[in-house]
C-alpha cells in the first residue's frame, strides 16, 4: 500500500508541476513595440534682439526693421537701450530678417566723446510641436556688433559715413520642419 501511495503522490506531483509551469509561461519570441508618437511642427517662435547700451543713442535715432510672422516688413524707432520682439510663425518655410538703421537726430553734442555700440540679432528660434513640446533649435552665439568710441567733433562724420557701411541685415531661414537651413549676414 505504501508503494501505491508513493507512486500516486509522484504522479500527482508531476501533474501539478506540469500544469502550474505551463500556465505561467510567456512568449519570448514576440516583441511588443511601444507606440510611436508622431509629433509634427505646429509653429516656431522667433526672437529678435537689439541692445544699444551707450551714450551714442542720445544723439541718434536707432531704427529697427524686421519681418513679422505674416511676412510683412515692420520698422520702428527704438526708445530704450534694449528691444526684444517675439513672433510666432506657422507658415513654413519662413525667413526671419532683422536690420538696423542709424540716423542723426536734432540733439546737441554735449559730451566730449560718444560710444556707439549696437548689438542686434535674430537671437533664437524655438520649435513648437503638436504635442506642446518646445525645443530651442537655434541660438545666435555671436550677434552682429558694431561700435566705436569717438570724440564729439568726429561723431557727425562717423554717423554719416561709417554706420551705413557696417550695418548689415541678418537672416535665417526655417524649413518646413522648423530647422534652421542657413544663417546669413548681408
Where in the sequence are the language-model features?
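Sec-dependent bacterial lipoprotein signal peptides
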Residues: 1-23
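Tryptophan-paired
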Residues: 65-105
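Extracytoplasmic electrostatic interaction patches
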Residues: 97-186
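Surface-exposed loop/edge segments in extracytoplasmic proteins
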Residues: 58-61, 69-84, 129-139
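Bacterial Sec-dependent N-terminal signal peptides
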Residues: 15-46
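Surface-exposed flexible segments
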Residues: 54-73, 109-121
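Short, surface-exposed binding/anchoring microloops in extracellular/periplasmic proteins
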Residues: 34-65
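Polar/charged side chains located within well-ordered beta-strands of beta-rich proteins
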Residues: 48, 85, 124-127
Amino acid at each position: 500500500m505504501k508503494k501505491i501511495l508513493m507512486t500516486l503522490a509522484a504522479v500527482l506531483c508531476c501533474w501539478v508541476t506540469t500544469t502550474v509551469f505551463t500556465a505561467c509561461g510567456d512568449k519570448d519570441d514576440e516583441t511588443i513595440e511601444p507606440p510611436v508618437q508622431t509629433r509634427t511642427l505646429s509653429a516656431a517662435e522667433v526672437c529678435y534682439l537689439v541692445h544699444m547700451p551707450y551714450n551714442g543713442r542720445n544723439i541718434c535715432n536707432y531704427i529697427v526693421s524686421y519681418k513679422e510672422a505674416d511676412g510683412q516688413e515692420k520698422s520702428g524707432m527704438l526708445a530704450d537701450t534694449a528691444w526684444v520682439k517675439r513672433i510666432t510663425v506657422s507658415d513654413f518655410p519662413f525667413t526671419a530678417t532683422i536690420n538696423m538703421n542709424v540716423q542723426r537726430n536734432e540733439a546737441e553734442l554735449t559730451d566730449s566723446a560718444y560710444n556707439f555700440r549696437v548689438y542686434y540679432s535674430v537671437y533664437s528660434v524655438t520649435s513648437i510641436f503638436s504635442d506642446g513640446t518646445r525645443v530651442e533649435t537655434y541660438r545666435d552665439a555671436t550677434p552682429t556688433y558694431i561700435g566705436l568710441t569717438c570724440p564729439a567733433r568726429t561723431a557727425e562724420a562717423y554717423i554719416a559715413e561709417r554706420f551705413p557701411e557696417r550695418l548689415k541685415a541678418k537672416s535665417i531661414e526655417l524649413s518646413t520642419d522648423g530647422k534652421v537651413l542657413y544663417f546669413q549676414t548681408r
